[in-house]
């Protein structure tokens, strides 16, 4: 029995009533739970001998807005314009029937040498999650970062302030509906002799990635690419 198989067996035996989903893919074990079950699950994962997850190595927010939608919705590939890099795909957009936001935790057991991902989805209308700072001190800045970038509140955090943006920043820049160029920019005004906020003067534009073609313009007579 591998380490992951042992871990899955123990999770199913001990936490079946608290988790809503358990998956294993690419050598990673992931469990999902509801917000109200987060702390009981985390306490068990930290304190039970068979788990012994003594370290929280990462915590992040995720915004699933438009998850799985096509970036380029065009009917055909052309030699110019926005659709020139289109490749037809049989796969359709993913259907996600879960809340828009999620919080993801990565746990490590230095005793058992195994890892676990814990995920919980949070309703957009009530973006509040219990803090795990009292369980792992490393959660302090992780939770502040998730609050700053996504607007997720962590109930019980001792100092939930912005971490990466400045004090007067409005909004949460890692949300998918936040403008890429931002809302305002900060600059020094020589007349006022102070730093001010002003609307961004960046003109929105579409950036098309480099397209590598494999057609007759680049294929030699022998069927290989020309140097």
Swiss-Prot record:
State which Enzyme Commission number(s) the record gives: 7.1.1.-
* Compartments, as annotated in UniProt: Cell inner membrane
Which GO molecular function annotations are given, in alphabetical order? NADH dehydrogenase (ubiquinone) activity; NADH:ubiquinone reductase (non-electrogenic) activity; quinone binding
The record's listing under InterPro entries reads:
NADH_DH_suC (IPR010218), NADH_quin_OxRdtase_su_C/D-like (IPR037232), NADH_UbQ_OxRdtase_30kDa_su (IPR001268), NADH_UbQ_OxRdtase_CS (IPR020396)
Q: What gene does the UniProt entry assign to this protein?
A: nuoC
Q: What is this protein called?
A: NADH-quinone oxidoreductase subunit C
What species is this protein from?
Answer: Legionella pneumophila (strain Corby)
The subunit field of the Swiss-Prot or TrEMBL record says: NDH-1 is composed of 14 different subunits. Subunits NuoB, C, D, E, F, and G constitute the peripheral sector of the complex.
SUPFAM superfamilies attached here?
Answer: Nqo5-like
Disulfide bond residue pairs? none
Q: Short name of one Pfam family for this protein?
A: Complex1_30kDa
């Amino acid at each position: 029995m591998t380490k992951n198989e042992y871990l899955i067996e123990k999770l199913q035996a001990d936490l079946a009533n608290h988790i809503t989903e358990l998956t294993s893919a690419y050598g990673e074990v992931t469990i999902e739970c509801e917000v109200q079950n987060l702390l009981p699950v985390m306490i068990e994962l930290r304190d039970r001998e068979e788990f012994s997850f003594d370290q929280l190595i990462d915590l992040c927010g995720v915004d699933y807005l438009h998850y799985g939608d096509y970036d380029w919705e065009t009917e055909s590939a052309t030699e110019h314009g926005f659709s020139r890099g289109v490749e037809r795909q049989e796969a359709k957009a993913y259907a996600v029937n879960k809340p828009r936001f999620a919080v993801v935790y990565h746990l490590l057991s230095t005793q058992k040498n195994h890892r676990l991902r814990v995920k919980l989805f949070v309703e957009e209308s009530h973006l509040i999650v219990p803090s795990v700072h009292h369980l792992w001190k490393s959660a302090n800045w992780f939770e502040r970062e998730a609050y700053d970038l996504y607007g997720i509140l962590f109930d019980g955090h001792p100092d939930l302030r912005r971490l990466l943006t400045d004090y007067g920043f409005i909004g949460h820049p890692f949300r998918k509906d936040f403008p890429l160029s931002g809302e305002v920019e900060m600059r020094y005004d020589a007349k006022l002799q102070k730093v001010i906020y002003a609307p961004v003067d960046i003109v929105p534009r579409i950036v098309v990635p480099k397209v590598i073609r494999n057609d007759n313009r680049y294929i030699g007579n022998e069927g290989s690419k020309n140097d």
